[in-house]
Amino acid sequence: MNSLSLSGKSWFLKKYNQEDVTFIKDNYSLDEITSKLLSIRKIKKEDINSFLNPVVKNFIPNPNTLIDMEKSSLRTYEAIMSNEKIGIFGDYDVDGASSTALLGNYLHELNLDFNIYIPDRKKEGYGPSIKSFKEFLDKKIKLIFTVDCGTLSFEAIDFAKKNNIDVIVLDHHQSEIKLPDAFSIINPNRFDDKSNLQNLCAAGVTFMFLVSLNRELRVKKWFQDNNINEPDLINYLDLVSLGTVCDVVPLTGLNRAFVKQGLKIIKLKKNLGIKTLLDICKIETNPTIYHLGFMLGPRINAGGRVGKCSHGANLLLNKDPKKSYSLASELDQFNEERKILESNLLQKILNETKTNVDDPVLILSGKNWHEGVIGIVAARLKDKLNKPVILISLENDIGKASARSITGFDIGSVIISATQENILIKGGGHKMAGGFSIKIENIDKFKNFAIRRFKNINEDISKEKPIFLDDVISPSAINLEFFNKVALLSPFGPGNPEPKFAIENLKTINGKIVAKKHIKSTLLGKDGSIIKTIAFNSVNKDLGEYLLKKNNKLFNIAGKLSLNEWRGQSNVEFIIDDISVNKNFKNTVPSSIG
């Protein structure tokens, strides 16, 4: 289907192999749509069962495939045997909070004491500092774990080593060829790691470490000798799935298994902090990726963005219901403050940005922009403009930046290279996001550096992307049975995108604005079927205007299915991404994704 739409995008039907579809239907007892979706995703026949039923034990490799894993487990065992004090330094985002809680809750289950340190974003910035490690030193801590950070923390780790403190880094951010002089660095994205686990977030890396440590303690008969029940690590997958979803890593292989099983653990509400957040958010249905990514995650992140940076980790570690409710309530309030700050800054930038809009990498700066929200505003602009965006908050003669990128442009690599060339003071990140500090006098130099790197990419990765559709369905297919067939391929996310469908020849019965920015509408199909739809953030846009006006013209919609659960009732609605009034469809797809 090739159709120019209200958004100016072309629609294309994805290709599938009919022989494969027939084989899958006949041999796996699956229906037409599920078989077609598996064919489109090019799932190998021998992998179909594991894809539809991803289980961690079937995907997880020997943790020792990660460099430094074995020595880290042995060092931690020695610390436990010697009653050494343990410190955990975590990042202030969801992945950092989840990783801190994973390690902390495990140590708690072993009846071991530990101290955590979450830096203040505004005062201390990202990653360990000499100041933070001095606090550990004053508490006579001899073993420090850094989680979701540490790979580029040369000064702090040198300070620790000089003071006879061992540092174990559990991270996933890209490294330089030179590594800090830590006791060990477990990071699938360190330059010399060959584990093929580069898509793990920090929570995934931390879980791998716990698997290794748990095995070490079992082999050494520590549980038996100390009359302590061995922890069931499956119960920790709620935290792993939370970090995995909120850090937006690819949901393929092991990550997909983490999330699939993790959602089941979240449903059991074993973690008091997660349970309290679910209650605060009034989530009464089975938790989904949406709930993690758009409801729980933003609240945990809000502490690090505009409130108290340690609240997220403390909530996920907490065992007291009253304290848990207090922390979750504060995070909920911080999130409301974050929304206002974000909206104001986004509007300010959109109003003032008249230059640089044609640059392939948009780099903007402003005095005293709130450091806690520039990252999320950069993400909004990146989605709107479909290009990498870097926002720099200026204070005195230093700028602090947050970057968000698009597929095909490795922003973490760009930041590390610019740091090595002394354009930046310090910085780091991964393929899709990063951060750095810079002298104001070097901003133009960095801008030229980033744009030059972008232009070295052969393909035009920033051009407007078409909408790729998995199938054209009838209005009568919008029901619970069809939704459940599609949901067999979940969880959906990067690497396993949610299926998109087109529905042809519809009329609007009615439409209304909800929450001041969305359009709910009721549509009528040629077959007489009535479907409920919603178009998010469509007010004052062509899409929204079309749905609100009365006309008898037939039109087509593209989007995805959504399950609405309310008071025990389940209804399927269609989320509209785009509208086309063109009837000239053809079953073609660009050869690039054939």
Task: For the regions a language model picked out, list residue spans one by one.
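Hydrophobic, well-structured modules enriched for small/aliphatic residues and gly/pro motifs
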Residues: 93, 150-153, 167-175
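Short alpha-helices
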Residues: 102, 181-224, 237-245
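Generic beta-sheet signal
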Residues: 117, 147, 170-172, 186-188, ...
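Short gly/pro/ser/thr-enriched loop/turn and capping motifs at secondary-structure boundaries
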Residues: 122-124, 153, 173-178, 192-194, ...
